[in-house]
Amino acid sequence: MLKKKKTEVYALGQHISMSADKARRVIDQIRGRSYEETLIILELMPYRACYPIFKLVYSAAANASYNMSSNDANLLISKAEVNEGTTIKKFKPRARGRSYPIKRPTCHITIVMKDISLDDEYVKINSLKKPRWKNKHTAMVYHDMYSSGGVWDKK
């Protein structure tokens, strides 16, 4: 029996103290990108969620270099997901003996990286791809060229 070589590694961050929606806003920007491009994006985005995600991406790359001895230039984020974690519930004391509940949401973030140099399917697909724009012979047309001149076309 032939054993397939491992092409994916992951890093998992649990109970990160932020809302899952705020983390998803950042994760949606990096999904499917290369490792180096992801680090640049995460350093330049102005969100608080970028730092824990940056640490997870860096950890997943370290896992890839240690477990698969892969190069950082060949890494691609194949899957990135955010799940809701437990909600931390506390009470804040207020005046006259009252208390207000505080709910701190947490989330679990999973980053899966793939080494494209080890993945045979990725190499085959990229070698078979042909640019689609070479087959089409369409000229660029100014969008207001065919306006009918009606009342609705004027600003």
UniProtKB/Swiss-Prot annotation:
It comes from Coffea arabica (Arabian coffee). Part of the 50S ribosomal subunit. GO terms for biological process: translation. GO terms for molecular function: rRNA binding; structural constituent of ribosome. This is Large ribosomal subunit protein uL22c. It comes from the Eukaryota. GO terms for cellular component: chloroplast; large ribosomal subunit. HAMAP family: Ribosomal_uL22_B. It is found in: Plastid, Chloroplast. Gene3D superfamilies: Ribosomal protein L22/L17. CDD domains: Ribosomal_L22 (cd00336). It holds the Pfam family Ribosomal_L22. Belongs to the universal ribosomal protein uL22 family. Keywords: Chloroplast, Plastid, Ribonucleoprotein, Ribosomal protein, RNA-binding, rRNA-binding. This protein binds specifically to 23S rRNA. The globular domain of the protein is located near the polypeptide exit tunnel on the outside of the subunit, while an extended beta-hairpin is found that lines the wall of the exit tunnel in the center of the 70S ribosome. Its main location: plastid. SUPFAM superfamilies: Ribosomal protein L22 (SSF54843). InterPro entries: Ribosomal_uL22, Ribosomal_uL22_bac/chlpt-type, Ribosomal_uL22_bac/org-type, Ribosomal_uL22_CS, Ribosomal_uL22_sf. The keyword Cell membrane does not apply. NCBIfam families: rplV_bact (TIGR01044).
